[in-house]
Amino acid sequence: MRRKTLFSGLLLFLLTCSSLTAGPAGTATPGLVDSPLAHTFSIVAIDQESGEMGVAVQSHWFSVGPVVPWAEPGVGAIATQSLVNISYGPLGLALLKGGKSASDVVKELTAGDNGRDYRQLAVVDAHGGVATWTGSLCIPEAGHITGKDYSVQANMMLRGTVWPAMAKAFEVARGPLAERMLAALEAAQEQGGDIRGRQSAAILVVRAVASDQPWNDKLVDLRVEDSEHPLVELRRLLQVHRAYEHMNAGDLAVEKGDFEIALKEYSTAESLNSDNPEMPFWHAVSLANVGRVDDSLPVFARAFHQGGKNWRELARRLPEVKLLTV
């Protein structure tokens, strides 16, 4: 009977929280019933040397990518999680864009939210400011660590060692920001991660200084929507993404007629994603275009073997558009 009474009380409490509550600057913020249950672990960070900033997250929740991570070039990056107030993402970016610091944003967003004790929020601004909030009613184990240029945060974890392990992994990792943030997520999973398990993950990286070409300012945007091993799949996707960065660089070199540079880029791409016929095909085209026809033949053969007859037909069409010049 006592358990039934407790359950009824909890249900009544949740139902009374279902209406919208006043939020920052007079906006409406969702009540608890409207909040996705994205209990999770995440990292927000900025690399001031490379000029990158972003968010990475894993959760036992379907398609966490549209919910938790938010970032805008030249503005900042935000993770909103636990019983998620999704409005923290766009509202927080708007506040940053208006000149507020990361600390100001966290204070303003949580101050106007009646459900703040259930929220977890982390913000990094384009100047390297970092601020985090972990509500007192986030499901244990829950906590965060704010370090130089980053914050790691987690809730509903199996162990309280998750976020310290994330911080350590990020601090010792080397390489691009996306790979360093992924290392932090992997360290969290090694500590047991979410007590419920794992399902989805995402990485979002943008430029810390916006350029006059906004289409080039989102550097990484990868999501694993539903997987038994989302971080394994996310790492695979990140490697494929890096391969295609080199493919894109190769394509640009071809446009400029710089086939030697194209050759280097396509070769690197193939080494990163050797099972995709796209990589050896354009590698072979570049070899042929710099006069290394004999070297191109086995690479063409590999592409044709992987991709089938359509790739042979594609090769036949390239001379007429001057992309195969031999």
Where are these regions (language model features)?
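N-terminal nucleophile
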Residues: 23-245, 256
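Canonical positions in the second alpha-helix
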Residues: 269, 302-303
